[in-house]
Amino acid sequence: MPSFDVVSKVDLQEVDNVVNNVKKEVDTRYDFRGSNTELSFDKGGASISILASDDMKMRAVQEMLLANCVRRKVDPKFLDFGKVEAASKGMVKRSVAVKDGISKETAQKIVKKIKASKLKVQAAIQDDQVRVTGKKIDDLQDVIQLLRDDDFGVPLQFINMRS
């Protein structure tokens, strides 16, 4: 029986490249001279921490992160920006979580959407992915199109198409 998996995976190496590009840009930009703006990426915890001297520089770093994500073909929906918090010496910090995988709630929304479409397919939640099976590949392609048309708050990839 044909099937495919719906996943939401981020390439952490590309995110690391994005952070390194932003670091280089911060080092070379004139408006960041003399400011102690720092970026660090924790691959294990999949989070980016930003430390800037004021809110304006924090917003500029955020815009640079988003622009570099687009440039490196990393979907900006993977980044979950936390609140700006005060740090020592008048600095501000922000934590950015890198979302990886489909949450249980999102997976349930995906399954509900597929079942509401009345297509002859079955959807099952498996850890951080959704497996869709059906008798016809055309039905599976219709499901892919249906899911692409809707926004679930996370970027979706469709892998392991088997017939």
From Swiss-Prot:
InterPro entries: DUF520, UPF0234-like_C, UPF0234_N, YajQ-like_sf. CDD domains: YajQ_like. PANTHER family: UPF0234 PROTEIN YAJQ (PTHR30476:SF0). GO terms for cellular component: cytosol. The keyword DNA repair does not apply. Nucleotide-binding protein. This is Nucleotide-binding protein Dde_2479. One of its GO terms (molecular function) is nucleotide binding. Keywords: Nucleotide-binding. Belongs to the YajQ family. Pfam families: DUF520. The keyword Cytoplasm does not apply. NCBIfam families: PRK05412.1. Disulfide bonds: none annotated.
